[in-house]
C-alpha cells in the first residue's frame, strides 16, 4: 500500500522544511518545487492543507515562506497522511461471505493495522535521518 502522489509530495516538502527547521529559515514554495520537481500549483495546495492541519506556519511577503510549526520529532507520518488524504481506510464494498473471501479480508485488515502501526511510530525526523543515510550511500561523481 504505497503512498499517493499527494502524500509523497507532501512528505518530500516536509523533509525539505525539516532540514531548514534547525536554523529557523523560511523556505519558499518555488525552492521546494525546483529541488524536487514538484508542480508548483499542486504543492501550494498541499502546503495550504498542511498549514491548516497545524504542521506548518507561513509568512507572507516577498521574503516569506514556510517553516515547520513544531519539531520534526513531533510530526508523525500517519498524521500527515490523514491531513492530506482524510482518514485512510481500505475500501471493501459488498464483502462476500465465502470463507476464502473472509480469510482474504482478515489478511487485508491485518495489513492495514500493521501499516497504521508503522506510520504511527514513524516521525518526520526519522524519515529525514533515513534520507540522509541514503544520500551518504549515493556515489559521488567528480569531473
Q: What is each of the regions a protein language model found here?
A:
Residues 47-48:
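Short, hydrophobic-biased segments on the C-terminal half of alpha helices
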Residues 3-38:
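N-terminal helix-turn-helix DNA-binding core of bacterial DNA-binding proteins
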Residues 34, 51-52:
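Alpha-helical residues within the helix-turn-helix
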Residues 72-96, 110-113:
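Conserved segment of winged-helix/HTH DNA-binding domains
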Residues 96-143:
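C-terminal regulatory/oligomerization modules of transcriptional regulators
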Amino acid at each position: 500500500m504505497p503512498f499517493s502522489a499527494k502524500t509523497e509530495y507532501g512528505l518530500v516538502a516536509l523533509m525539505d522544511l525539516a532540514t531548514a527547521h534547525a536554523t529557523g529559515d523560511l523556505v519558499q514554495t518555488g525552492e521546494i518545487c525546483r529541488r524536487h520537481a514538484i508542480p508548483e500549483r499542486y504543492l501550494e495546495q498541499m502546503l495550504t492543507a498542511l498549514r491548516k492541519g497545524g504542521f506548518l506556519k507561513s509568512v507572507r511577503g516577498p521574503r516569506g515562506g514556510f517553516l515547520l510549526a513544531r519539531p520534526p520529532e513531533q510530526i508523525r507520518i500517519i498524521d500527515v497522511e490523514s491531513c492530506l488524504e482524510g482518514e485512510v481506510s481500505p475500501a471493501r464494498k459488498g464483502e462476500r461471505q465465502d470463507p476464502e473471501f473472509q480469510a482474504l479480508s482478515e489478511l487485508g485488515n491485518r495489513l492495514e493495522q500493521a501499516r497504521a502501526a508503522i506510520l504511527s511510530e514513524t516521525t518526520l525526523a526519522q524519515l529525514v535521518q533515513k534520507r540522509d543515510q541514503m544520500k551518504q550511500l549515493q556515489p559521488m561523481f567528480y569531473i
